[in-house]
Amino acid sequence: MKWTEVKVETASEAVEAISNIMMEAGASGVAIEDALDIENFESDLYGEILDKEQFTHIKEGAIVMAYFPETTFLTEILPFMKENILRLPEYGLSIGKNEMTISEVAESDWATAWKKYYHPVRVTRFLTIVPSWEAYHAQDEAEKIITLDPGMAFGTGTHPTTRLTLQALETVLRGGETVLDVGTGSGVLSIASRYLGAKDVYAYDLDEVAVAAAKENMDLNPIAADVHVSANDLLKGIDHSADVIVANILADIIVLMIEDAWRLLKQDGTFIISGIIEDKKAMVLEALTKVGFVVDQLFNQGDWYAIILKKPEEE
């Protein structure tokens, strides 16, 4: 069997959104080559884990590669992908060159080709993300290993938005909390929350493919076996009160869930948001403070921001 590779040259900030578009179009897998991965590695404060030669050296931007069975009707799905990618700037995401190329890949090449883009990465002081096929052992007692199968490509921990969110969770969680993870994708934030001591974790995603991928990744991490994963539109209809709500999604989508987040957070609860590009930060903060949230901390990597907010206790 042969596979069709659809390759999109884009900007780093659009990688996760384009990956999701490709999966929605029916891709069997997605691989990402991102110049930011090299930058993240070289500036990593948490110790070198990898040999830099494991990364493919592209100088700028990113390449997203999706793989479809040769029987796929590309004439139907290509317009869908192109149209949705062209809409990303409406959400504040640069799509860079946005050049799409198509080629054939043999079955033997497809089986292993995409795996070369994923290796163990220390993403925070305590958390290391390891692909499911890699043999890796903790370097010290404090290191926690999150095992992921990135074949479904819903965030693998190396994108700035994911790393910033993980750092924020590590800052906030002290043990025993109830956490709501909105737009869970791969489930990495929910798994991290359990490793960082959260007692009850609920993970939601509108995309059934993401829900399935998250459940598979929970199975790879026994500590997360009791995470509740389900399909849901943001926090609509949810009635679980929470100590922490975390959302690594587009800024415009975060604004839509602010009132529900306020409703569900306990007094002195914490709202962690990420996926905020510089151009959208002021708009999001204005909407949050209007409801009553108070900014506690900001994290940034380049133009990307994660923000920790508090719901003040009533006087």
UniProtKB/Swiss-Prot annotation:
InterPro entries: Ribosomal_L11_MeTrfase_PrmA, Ribosomal_PrmA_MeTrfase, SAM-dependent_MTases_sf
Cited NCBIfam families: prmA (TIGR00406)
Subcellular location: Cytoplasm
GO CC, any one term: cytoplasm
A Pfam family hit: PrmA
Membership in a protein family: Belongs to the methyltransferase superfamily. PrmA family.
SUPFAM superfamilies associated with the record: S-adenosyl-L-methionine-dependent methyltransferases (SSF53335)
Native source species: Enterococcus faecalis (strain ATCC 700802 / V583)
Entry protein name: Ribosomal protein L11 methyltransferase
Binding site for S-adenosyl-L-methionine: T162, G183, D205, N248
Gene3D superfamilies registered for this protein in UniProt: Vaccinia Virus protein VP39
GO-annotated molecular function: protein-lysine N-methyltransferase activity
Function statement: Methylates ribosomal protein L11.
Catalyses which reaction(s): L-lysyl-[protein] + 3 S-adenosyl-L-methionine = N(6),N(6),N(6)-trimethyl-L-lysyl-[protein] + 3 S-adenosyl-L-homocysteine + 3 H(+)
